[in-house]
Amino acid sequence: MKKMLPESKVEAIRKEGFLNRAVEAYRFFYPTVSNVSNFKALNDLGITENHDFIIQLTTPDLNVLTQNSDTPYCLGTGNTENGPVVIELPQGAIVGVADDINFKFITNMGLTGDEQGKGAKYLYLPPNYDGDIPDGYIVRKPSSYRFLICLR
């Protein structure tokens, strides 16, 4: 017959499980919380989703996750809750990325994107979209409705 663990050992294992879950939740949600703060900051500056972009001039005293301190950035947000969104990128020496609300990579854009700097129309579809997809677009389907576009 097997013996039960002492209550103190059971409690220690339970506490360790709670701690592990808390660390896991923190690591999972940290990028999401960080990106939601980007959306809030852009909204506070008057940027309208699916419509406006802002040019951010960075300096060494600006403390921002993953940005270079001497590079100007063009930032905007998209939201596919009301249907597909098109981002038209002009030809040129542009390097960019789109990330979903959880800061998970969607696509590269510009020189590192599928169009390799030749310019293109990116079509962002809502999750679970099952409608027609027109020709002539680079199609992306983020896992969330909201996404961030960062160009430089």
Residue ranges and their predicted role:
Residues M1-R152:
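A compositional/structural signature for long, glycine/proline-rich flexible linkers
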